[in-house]
Amino acid sequence: MRFCSVFLVFGLAAAMGVSHAADLPPRESYQRPADIPSPPDNPLTIEKAALGKTLFFDPRLSRDGSMSCATCHNPGMRWSDGRILPLRADGVEHARRTPTVLNSAWLTTLMWDGRATSLEDQAILPITTAHEMNFEMPLLLNRLKDVAGYAPLFARAFGDAEITEKRLTQALASFQRTLVSKLAPFDVWVEGDESAMSERAKRGFAVFKGKARCATCHSSWRFTDDSFHDIGLPSLDPGRGARVPPQVTIMQHAFKTPTLRDLPRNGPFMHDGSMHSLDEVIRHYEQGGLQRPSISAEMKRFELTETEREYLIEFIHTLDGGLLDIEPPQLPE
């Protein structure tokens, strides 16, 4: 499905020796794809995405009716929650920050530790986890069946009004696949408009690809390699390491590389929300992180000048396309 059709339906470097665009890295690898991917057993349709949107915003998906998917993945907060750490159902803070769901159609593993391998699989986890939405799936399905307004929505999406776990997760996944970040100044520059990025931002891109080596992990048009790395934060959270044999040292304390799309206004940063500015994040990488056996081989010390740091931050701001024009739906009764 083309980006434009989905959005219509939903309303939806002097300091571095770089001074000309021709000196910058090739742009082709940063071009956005024309289509949103979906699995063969759950092709993306407008009707499924519309149902998924309604479910995403419905707090009745939680046991006590107080929490929807949008509670933590708030469209007004770049599909995160703006908190250092989100609150569990019992009022205790989670150990990990709420990641954005933007551009999740392209993910092959989801959640900070990669425990889910598809959006369909991921959709079940927060609903049924005791300290999140805390609902048993059979009870949830019965609750939805008691809401008369859901039957026609399921019928339009799937051909009949049967409400099942598979259909629930397919609809939620379909809606999330439509959440694609808007065109940012960087994208306009990639397409050839030199005026879309300032000279300072272009120099920052050169720092990003060169001296700072950010692109080693923050690659492709989504600015992530979809892999897991220990970047030397002091947290003792095992991350991906809890899901692989302990002898796989490199995965201990490793977390999924987050996208940099729409990042500047989506802080705080890191999986544990421990950093509050892009300057703080960059300085962490300059210092090389906490040295331990699992630390990524890419975590090598380097030093930027204050000007280079400013250029780099200005470049990262060009990856911000702004808020999606998505209004909460009217919930069925």
UniProtKB/Swiss-Prot annotation:
<dbReference type="InterPro" id="IPR022394">
    <property type="entry name" value="Methylamine_utilis_MauG"/>
</dbReference>
<dbReference type="InterPro" id="IPR051395">
    <property type="entry name" value="Cytochrome_c_Peroxidase/MauG"/>
</dbReference>
<comment type="pathway">
    <text>One-carbon metabolism; methylamine degradation.</text>
</comment>
<dbReference type="InterPro" id="IPR004852">
    <property type="entry name" value="Di-haem_cyt_c_peroxidsae"/>
</dbReference>
<dbReference type="Pfam" id="PF03150">
    <property type="entry name" value="CCP_MauG"/>
</dbReference>
<keyword id="KW-0560">Oxidoreductase</keyword>
<dbReference type="GO" id="GO:0030416">
    <property type="term" value="P:methylamine metabolic process"/>
</dbReference>
<keyword id="KW-0813">Transport</keyword>
<feature type="binding site" description="axial binding residue">
    <location>
        <position position="218"/>
    </location>
    <ligand>
        <name>heme c 2</name>
    </ligand>
</feature>
<dbReference type="GO" id="GO:0042597">
    <property type="term" value="C:periplasmic space"/>
</dbReference>
<dbReference type="GO" id="GO:0020037">
    <property type="term" value="F:heme binding"/>
</dbReference>
<feature type="binding site" description="covalent">
    <location>
        <position position="214"/>
    </location>
    <ligand>
        <name>heme c 2</name>
    </ligand>
</feature>
<keyword id="KW-0479">Metal-binding</keyword>
<feature type="signal peptide">
    <location>
        <begin position="1"/>
        <end position="21"/>
    </location>
</feature>
<keyword id="KW-0732">Signal</keyword>
<feature type="binding site" description="covalent">
    <location>
        <position position="69"/>
    </location>
    <ligand>
        <name>heme c 1</name>
    </ligand>
</feature>
<dbReference type="GO" id="GO:0004130">
    <property type="term" value="F:cytochrome-c peroxidase activity"/>
</dbReference>
<dbReference type="InterPro" id="IPR026259">
    <property type="entry name" value="MauG/Cytc_peroxidase"/>
</dbReference>
<keyword id="KW-0249">Electron transport</keyword>
<keyword id="KW-0408">Iron</keyword>
<dbReference type="GO" id="GO:0005509">
    <property type="term" value="F:calcium ion binding"/>
</dbReference>
<feature type="binding site" description="axial binding residue">
    <location>
        <position position="271"/>
    </location>
    <ligand>
        <name>heme c 1</name>
    </ligand>
</feature>
<keyword id="KW-0574">Periplasm</keyword>
<feature type="binding site" description="covalent">
    <location>
        <position position="217"/>
    </location>
    <ligand>
        <name>heme c 2</name>
    </ligand>
</feature>
<protein>
    <recommendedName>
        <fullName>Methylamine utilization protein MauG</fullName>
        <ecNumber>1.-.-.-</ecNumber>
    </recommendedName>
</protein>
<comment type="function">
    <text>Involved in methylamine metabolism. Essential for the maturation of the beta subunit of MADH, presumably via a step in the biosynthesis of tryptophan tryptophylquinone (TTQ), the cofactor of MADH.</text>
</comment>
<dbReference type="InterPro" id="IPR009056">
    <property type="entry name" value="Cyt_c-like_dom"/>
</dbReference>
<dbReference type="GO" id="GO:0009055">
    <property type="term" value="F:electron transfer activity"/>
</dbReference>
<feature type="binding site" description="axial binding residue">
    <location>
        <position position="73"/>
    </location>
    <ligand>
        <name>heme c 1</name>
    </ligand>
</feature>
<dbReference type="InterPro" id="IPR036909">
    <property type="entry name" value="Cyt_c-like_dom_sf"/>
</dbReference>
<feature type="binding site" description="covalent">
    <location>
        <position position="72"/>
    </location>
    <ligand>
        <name>heme c 1</name>
    </ligand>
</feature>
<keyword id="KW-0349">Heme</keyword>
